[in-house]
């Protein structure tokens, strides 16, 4: 099990980004959270097996929302992370 954090910038708020991110995560068996940040970016914590997590990251970089676009993803691996049981949108 691997955990990553992502800070995603671009047109990622107000375009269904969090909802589509949650749908992709659930389809791939990824757990974690997604939330909007005050600076207009989106933060994601994603946890899963290596291959599904790689697919998830690729989909995020390609922008899961057709109405938005991703300019940059700051990706970090986390050790000793909290264990998630589902993927949820944090408000």
Curated annotation (Swiss-Prot):
It comes from the Bacteria. SUPFAM superfamilies: Acylphosphatase/BLUF domain-like. Keywords: Hydrolase. The active site is at 18, 36. It catalyses: an acyl phosphate + H2O = a carboxylate + phosphate + H(+). It is an enzyme of class 3 (hydrolase). GO terms for molecular function: acylphosphatase activity. Residues 3-91 form the Acylphosphatase-like domain. Its EC number is 3.6.1.7. Pfam families: Acylphosphatase (PF00708). PANTHER family: ACYLPHOSPHATASE (PTHR47268:SF4). Belongs to the acylphosphatase family. This is Acylphosphatase. It comes from Lactobacillus gasseri (strain ATCC 33323 / DSM 20243 / BCRC 14619 / CIP 102991 / JCM 1131 / KCTC 3163 / NCIMB 11718 / NCTC 13722 / AM63). The gene is acyP.
